Amino acid sequence: MPISQEVAYWSVVEQAKAIKEGKFTSRELLELTIERIESVNPELNAVVTMDLDLARKLADEADAKLKAGAVVGPLHGIPITVKDALETAGIRSTGGATELHNHVPDRDAPVVKAVKEAGAIVLGKTNLPRWSGDIQAYNDMFGTTVNPWNSDRVPGGSSGGAAAAVSAGLSSFEIGTDIGGSIRFPASFCGIYGHKPSFGVVPSTGYIDHEAGGTTEADVNVIGPMARSAEDLELLLELMLRKEGPLVASLAEPPEDVTSLKVAAWLDDPFCPIDAQVASVLEAAVKNLENTGLSVDREARPDIDP
């Protein structure tokens, strides 16, 4: 019996829990996702490459492991797409550039490897602007991705296909990239959650920018999760965090007494005005910080030229 369409919009945490409890199988969730893609993607144009034979094989293997009583990861059997700026072993990875239209990597970007090791199943790739260089999702190979809420609008960019896929229930979560808003803009435009991590805490090799491979760490780009809940972001970021190497973050534990912390609140700026509704949400967040006893400075600004 097919599972409810509503399951396609559940959080990753909810979907993974249901699979482990036997409420539905990984294969059933995958087939629901494929059904959603076949129904919605012709207009949405978010998912641009798929390997469904491999995805089905991996979903069946995931179900067999669970049936055998194997210890499984927190993302066991979860079907996902990945932004086409990241290398995925055995699945075409182009960066939105015609020069790489036949590029099929033999290895995964470390963040892709991390979520796969946690049990996720990569079924395909999502659209983006050429070399991730725009605030929309269009390129000469795959065309334009539209906003799932209004096809006359853009989904944002550069992780526009990723955000649209998550919002429309075509992927349980996504992995985006961000320099100047490429996770945050599309997450906002499509009504989902996105997080740009601090520099260095998530490995950025395997990112496709003007070349295949991405063997060096990006100097300004970061990679982060996109999902349908804040709880999912927490889980996914923990899985993506750098585990080894010279750039492993050594962050101090949060102090027990938060009143020793000082927060700079930069809520608006004449060079970048924001909507009143956004301002009210930010102001409420600052008020919550003040209510916990933190010191808030509303005048502090970074030492940069406007």
Q: Which residue stretches match the model-derived regions?
A:
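Acyltransferase
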Residues: 26-30, 60, 248, 276-302
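Enzymes and membrane/adaptor proteins characterized by extended Gly/Ser/Thr/Asp/Glu-rich
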Residues: 74-111, 217
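Short glycine/serine-rich loop segments
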Residues: 107-237
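Short, well-ordered beta-strand elements within core beta-sheets of diverse protein domains
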Residues: 15-21, 99-103, 221-228
